[in-house]
Amino acid sequence: MNCREIIRKLLLNPAHNNAATRTAQGDNGDSNQRAYTRISRLAAFQSAQTQESTPKTNGTGRATTEGLTEAEVRWLVMESRALFMSQPMLVEIAAPVRICGDVHGQYTDLLRLFDLGGFPPDANYIFLGDYVDRGDQSLETICLLLAYKLSFPETFFLLRGNHECSSINRIYGFFDECKRRYSVRLWKQFTDTFNCMPVAGLVEGRILCMHGGLSPELTDLDQIRRILRPTDVPDSGLICDLLWSDPSTNMESNWSENDRGVSWTFSESVVKSFNKKFDLDLICRAHQVVDAGYEFFAARQLVTVFSAPNYCDEFDNAGAFMCVDENLMCSFVQIEPTRTLLRYFF
């Protein structure tokens, strides 16, 4: 088993190609988003590695283009666990890099994101968590991301979100998808891998990234580095806050109980004081739907990035990702919402 074959199957599956040659249409019927086609994904795959065009078999005689076997997914999950354990809890990331927010099983939109930002290794990425649940293609989404992580371990980074936790994804869709398409055993192995994922990233020492936000317990970045793994997400404390907390403008104090029932909300002054103390330019986090796909807070010292357009098929939000260049200048690329949401499976 190898990542080349898994990526090939995820990007070039004939069932994907038939659907992906269509162009997403906006509310006015005009094409308002680049088509994501078999040709673009074929070029992306070939730019990453050489792969013979003849389909291989998996030992049972079944062509691998039909989909990933449970053994292949299990291999991908276990290899990723070992890689996560070999890297720190606070990963150090070099610019340039694209920073992406929640994806939530919206696999088609993940391909749109790569179509706009460049498929690895043509661009470097850090994703801020919440790969599974809510969307109907969590398995495609997490498998492609893990395959890219294994293929490009020093330029492709995946942080843990609050949905990379068994108590959450047991309820919001990922457990049911694993059980229906593979097995409960595989879901448990995903859980073991999620428990080893890093929870924060630092871009060139100036941009701190996490899924949720700050914590009243965070007084030294070495606290993150010293977190032991594997670990579940506790109900309170540093890990919980990094994955669950939110900024808020409606604050009578610096910290207040979060309406989610978990963790805290924090004020603008908390962000400004934190950035000054640690000599940071920006905090980049995800975790909340924002209409434009990105939204600033605290005089542009914190930004929320959300990369799942038309979230849950219930919102008209755009998705977005942030591009950080070599000089740490930041810009944003939007993934426009569409009424025509394409879905295809491996």
Swiss-Prot record:
Claim: Membrane is one of the keywords in the record: no
Binding sites annotated in the UniProt record for Mn(2+) 1: D102, H104, D130
Annotated residues for binding of Mn(2+) 2: D130, N162, H211, H287
GO molecular-function terms, A-Z: metal ion binding; protein serine/threonine phosphatase activity
Alphabetic keyword roster: Hydrolase, Manganese, Metal-binding, Protein phosphatase
The protein's required cofactors: Mn(2+)
SUPFAM superfamilies for this protein: Metallo-dependent phosphatases
Pfam families referenced in this protein's UniProt entry, alphabetically: Metallophos, STPPase_N
Catalysed transformations (reactions): O-phospho-L-seryl-[protein] + H2O = L-seryl-[protein] + phosphate; O-phospho-L-threonyl-[protein] + H2O = L-threonyl-[protein] + phosphate
Protein EC: 3.1.3.16
An annotated GO cellular component: cytoplasm
The record's free-text note on cofactor binding: Binds 2 manganese ions per subunit.
Group of enzyme by EC: hydrolase
Enzyme active site: H163 (proton donor)
Note, other: Trypanosoma brucei contains two PP1 genes which are highly similar.
Family stated for the protein in its record: Belongs to the PPP phosphatase family. PP-1 subfamily.
Annotated protein name in UniProt: Serine/threonine-protein phosphatase PP1(5.9)
Source organism: Trypanosoma brucei brucei
